């Protein structure tokens, strides 16, 4: 058996620290306005609807949803399923590209036929509140999205 050097131990510690830092790829703020940060910088979404799709999936707390379910909730007044499905595919592709640009491509999961957010890879005030009950919620939740009012009322 080889003796272990201090350098070997430090290398292993750095590897473990690196893994821990990589565990949470994004910081997501749901209380107040919905915002997403990567490495302390605000993530820029090309389309507001892409950001809203991500917010919607966060609101679902990692639950898998089919494209049809997402369209039914996100486009309730539009009955053109083909058009809605095509638009959703564009939004999903845009979301994938946005997340990839900040090194967080694994956050969005596509498990045919469903989409979901891998909540283990994000730090989120809403999810932390649900898990711990710490009093972080001050009455405002994803204020820019009217569909989030139901969740806000439940909190």
Short names for language-model regions:
Residues 4-155:
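Intrinsically disordered, low-complexity protein-interaction/activation regions
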